[in-house]
Design a protein with these regions (language model features):
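Bacterial N-terminal signal peptides that target proteins for export
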Residues: 2-11
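Bacterial N-terminal signal peptides
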Residues: 11-19
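Sec-dependent signal peptide cleavage junction
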Residues: 18-32
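Ser/Thr/Gly/Pro-rich low-complexity, disordered linker/stalk segments of secreted
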Residues: 31-69
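N-terminal accessory beta-strand-rich subdomains and adjacent acidic, glycine-rich linkers
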Residues: 67, 73-162, 167-547, 911, ...
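Active-site-proximal substrate-binding groove within the catalytic cores of carbohydrate-active enzymes
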Residues: 84, 133, 243-244, 250-262, ...
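Aromatic-lined carbohydrate-binding/catalytic grooves of carbohydrate-active enzymes
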Residues: 552-638, 642-703
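Structural preference for beta-strand elements that scaffold enzyme active sites
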Residues: 600-602, 646-648, 721-724, 763-765
């Protein structure tokens, strides 16, 4: 054996074996992101080397899955061994023969001489009489001589005098670890150094087999699990610490993390078990799966990014700490070091990175900057034999079932809290739902886990893939974190060549943290258990308090006051404020609804001020004259107070025009590329940016707290105790100019704004709510009733609603915006959602050629009767349940069964349009007249 063979064996052992992380994924409608690359489709992504122009996906497409166990080719026969070689001794059931020193002179058969040129030692199995190994001398010392077989599957020691064999070891698996060997009786495992002359760690077993596995241990609390065939490593780690519920394990060599759930007798691994034997995976994929940390770094001058994996690309150092370990990953080639702390708490494991501790040797334009990090991003990966699903909080929620056969579908990527809208797309993006909650769930047979991103969530994206996607047989879900974002721009109007620029300066997010909660359940777990665990996290850890005071459902209404419309004045086109729903009309709509039986109405009133109508920053709370002015507004308030109507004046300041002290030149968000962030309409035919309407400016987050303070004062002056902030409870974006506001900082500014408003005794309604808004809002409207519907999804579930029911009052998406309003009513009822309608008082023809022409469906005249009647239906079946949590939700075809904490069972039949509550049937037709929504 030559030195290069030893070097190669050591390198291979470092680059493969017992670890894992996750395979990210690309959401439909986005670029197909392979492995860990987080780049735009225009940016070349290298895999380990910056000069490669193809991304991982292209490389893997060309790389075939050729990973096979190494095999020894025995070319010499037992007869030739016994005839031409010198017998030594029998050791562990094998008789060994040594090559004579003068074999070239004494053997006349040239073919035999050629064979013996590469064979110094041969072993014949005493039981079968067959040659089982041939070996060459590798090294020697004063104690023994080391012999290795050509494929390094056999390791043999002889005494220094070459008189007898003293030890025989056989490799467990070259796919797992080329330095891990077993004794012939399978009682002992030994991990050798790369020179094979020293045992770094040894383990023993009593031979007991459980679930097809054999466990080896040692005095240092290490535990190695082999398949009962002794030819595959299932897992390897040492015990670190424990508490009453959980125990933490780590592999010092590979940084594999294990979390043992004592109650369930379940070990959760950061690496798919037996990953080295994935027959569908390429070497690159196995390395990816075998990495507990993955990183992307960017090179600004080269405008490129490069993937790095802890397996093969990083030196790993493990240090025990109180209740956990700190693992330092040193990516020498990139000049980057990333420390990660893994801490065992009472009922969860936390993985955490303090970005200030990350070391980058060169952060100049010619250096290497960390842009993305993924830690434990395939924790709890499921095999092709497992049964279960991932719970994905996309929109209302969705399930991705393990091994669903959707190999050709794009894997999933969802940006937590939505994508950063400052990076305005050249073409209209696909219409998708948003990830409102920074978490996901794993349900695997009798076990389940809730995973939540507790810090750095504003820069997280959730990825998931099923077996067969990305050339892996595993099902994987996890978080990736963008620590420096990028943007693309085009020079001189050339839209064919995009240039990439990275976010300047230090990483703006201080901490990245993910918690892994194994669930304690008496019965087989499902997604309602995951929802309960997340609800408990919100109330116990995230500062969310229950505000679901109404036991009966509400009727949520969005009124739209006015808009800008071009009219002809003396033949001259003039843009004028135009009423869509005057205050007097709003009162009449409410009265008509009340006359029809509607109760507990909650109104979100958009564009009710002059600033709101004109698109300026809306903070003065001054009623628009075109809607009836201050007197009519006060009359509407008085009516609402007297009739139990909750009125939320809405102010939506995401986009703006100059005025009211804020100007597009100074207060517009700046993109990473350095240009202003302008929001365009898109051409309906071609999907390209339209110039028909002037683009709107995106308001800088730097103004949020100041505006909140002014808004609070003005509302207090006008005795307004409620407000809606429109899209500013769902939209999250940074300002990358002189303000240097990251998404993480923008989230902090939004939370400070919510706090200022609520500290002023003003109640917030959220028109959709990201998780960070939940501690501040009283109730939520426009909660989606479906997911984005990606092909990889198997089923929509009302996960958001299950989390919120009994915690916050909420309504679903607008019934009258749906093409199937009856189904929307029934789905709302099935998910415990109050009903929601959009309405305007004027004819819908008034909307033509205005910014609100998308409200073509919202005629109050057309929908008042239907809204009142469907509310009566909703109240009949959901009365008394508003403060109860949902404990069960199951869909079987068109029948949905919802169970509440007080034992009430609501069965909704979508096809028959009948809802049964504890055995009593309620037919929708008995409440809602046919055609009542389109009589106008």
């Amino acid at each position: 054996m030559k030195n290069w063979k030893k070097w190669a064996a050591g390198l291979f052992a470092l680059s493969l074996c017992l670890t894992s992380v996750s395979l990210p994924a690309a959401a439909e409608g986005e670029e197909d992101i392979a492995l860990i690359a987080d780049t735009s489709e225009e940016t070349p992504v290298a895999d380990g080397t910056p000069d490669e122009t193809a991304g991982d996906g292209e490389a893997d497409a060309e790389e075939e899955a050729t990973r096979t166990e190494t095999q020894e080719e025995i070319e010499i026969t037992a007869e030739q061994v016994t005839q031409y070689m010198q017998k030594k001794n029998s050791c562990d059931g094998i008789t060994f023969y040594y090559r004579p020193e003068d074999y070239e002179d004494t053997i006349s058969d040239e073919d035999v001489v050629d064979l013996l040129d590469d064979i110094e030692l041969a072993g014949i199995d005493d039981a079968t009489g067959e040659v089982v190994c041939t070996l060459e001398e590798d090294s020697d010392n004063s104690d023994f001589v080391v012999f290795l077989s050509p494929e390094s599957r056999w390791l043999v020691y002889m005494d220094p005098e070459y008189t007898k064999v003293t030890m025989v070891r056989q490799i467990v698996s070259s796919l797992d670890n080329e330095l891990l060997f077993r004794s012939r009786d399978n009682k002992t495992l030994e991990l050798y150094n790369k020179d094979y002359d020293e045992v770094e760690r040894s383990y023993t077993t009593d031979g007991a087999v459980k679930d097809g596995k054999v466990t080896y241990t040692n005095e240092d609390s290490w535990q190695v699990v082999l398949a009962d065939t002794y030819d595959a490593v299932i897992s390897s780690a040492r015990f670190v610490t424990e508490n009453d519920k959980l125990a933490l394990y780590v592999d010092d060599d590979t940084a594999v993390i294990g979390l043992y759930d004592k109650a369930k007798d379940k070990m959760w691994w950061s690496t798919p078990e037996n990953v080295g034997h994935d027959k569908t995976a390429t070497n690159t994929i196995v390395e990816d799966l075998s990495s507990s940390l993955k990183m992307v770094y960017g090179e600004p001058d080269a405008r490129s990014t490069t993937n790095m994996r802890s397996r093969g690309d990083a030196k790993i150092k493990v240090k025990d700490k109180s209740s956990g370990v700190k693992i330092t990953y040193s990516f020498k080639k990139a000049g980057i070091t990333v420390p990660v702390t893994y801490t065992l708490e009472d009922d969860y494991l936390e993985a955490k990175i303090d970005t200030a501790d990350i070391k980058e040797e060169d952060t100049s334009q010619s250096g290497k900057l960390v842009t993305s990090l993924s830690m434990l991003s395939n924790f709890g990966a499921a095999s092709s034999a497992d049964t279960g699903y991932f719970v994905i909080p996309d929109g209302s929620g969705a399930l991705i079932r393990f091994n669903n056969g959707k190999k050709t579908a794009k894997s999933y990527t969802g940006y937590v809290y939505g994508s950063d809208v400052t990076a305005v797309a050249q073409t209209e993006p696909a219409v998708t739902e948003q990830v409102y909650l920074p978490m996901y769930g794993i349900v695997n047979g009798d076990n389940a886990m809730m995973v939540v991103c507790t810090e750095g969530d504003s820069n997280a994206k959730l990825t998931a893939s099923v077996s067969g996607q990305s050339k892996s047989s595993f099902n994987i879900c996890g978080f990736d974190f963008t620590v420096r974002d990028s943007d693309t721009y085009y020079m001189s109007g050339d839209n064919s060549t995009a240039l990439t620029v990275f976010e300047d300066g230090d990483m703006k997010t201080d901490t990245l943290a993910v918690r892994y909660y194994p669930l304690e359940t008496e019965d087989t777990p499902d997604y309602t258990d995951v929802a309960e665990a997340y609800r408990n996290y919100l109330t116990e850890e995230a500062g969310v308090t229950g505000t679901a005071e109404d036991t009966d459902p509400g009727l949520y209404l969005n009124f739209y006051g006015g808009t800008i419309k071009e009219k002809s004045v003396l033949g001259v086109p003039v843009k004028m404020k135009t009423a869509l729903t005057s205050f007097e009309q709003a009162e009449q709509i409410l009265q008509d609804l009340s006359d029809g039986g509607a109760e507990n109405m909650k109104v979100q009133y958009y564009n009710w001020t002059n600033a709101g109508i004109s698109g300026k920053v809306d903070l003065k709370a001054k009623a628009a004259g075109c809607l009836g002015g201050n007197s009519d507004w006060k009359a509407l308030q008085s009516y609402a107070d007297s009739n139990g109507v909750t009125l939320y004046p809405a102010t939506d300041n995401e986009t703006f025009k100059s005025g009211n002290g804020y100007y597009t030149f100074t207060d517009t968000t700046v993109r990473i590329s350095g240009s202003y962030a302008r929001i365009y309409d898109y051409n309906l035919a071609y999907g390209t940016q339209s110039t028909a309407n002037k683009p709107l400016s995106l308001l800088s987050p730097a103004t949020f707290t100041e505006i909140a303070e002014k808004l609070t004062g003005n509302n207090q002056d006008k005795s307004l105790s409620r407000v809606s902030l429109g899209s500013l409870t769902t939209a999250l974006y940074g300002d990358y100019g002189k303000q240097e506001i990251s998404r993480d900082k923008a989230q902090q500014l939004l939370e400070e704004s919510y706090q200022k408003i609520t500290d002023g005794d003003i109640t917030l309604l959220a028109d959709g709510a990201n998780a960070y808004a939940l501690p501040y809002v009283q109730e939520i409207t426009d909660v989606p009733l479906q997911s984005s519907g990606f092909d990889v999804f198997d089923e929509d579930i009302p996960f958001y609603q299950i989390v919120m029911h009994g915690l916050k009052s909420y309504a679903g998406s607008a019934v009258n915006a749906s093409a199937t309003p009856e189904e929307t009513v029934l789905l709302s009822i099935a998910s415990g959602s109050s009903l929601h309608f959009d309405m305007i008082g004027e004819e819908t023809s008034t909307l033509k050629d205005t910014a609100l022409d998308g409200l073509y469906y919202a005629s109050a005249e057309s929908w008042t009767d239907y809204a009142a009647q469907s509310y009566a239906f909703s109240k009949a079946v959901l009365s008394g349940l508003g403060d109860q949590t949902i404990t069960g939700y199951e869909r079987n075809g068109d029948v949905i069964t919802t169970t509440y904490a007080n034992g009430t069972v609501v069965e909704t039949d979508l096809s028959k349009q009948i809802v049964t509550v504890d055995g009593k049937a309620y037919a929708m037709a008995d409440y809602v007249e046919e055609g009542s929504w389109n009589e106008a």
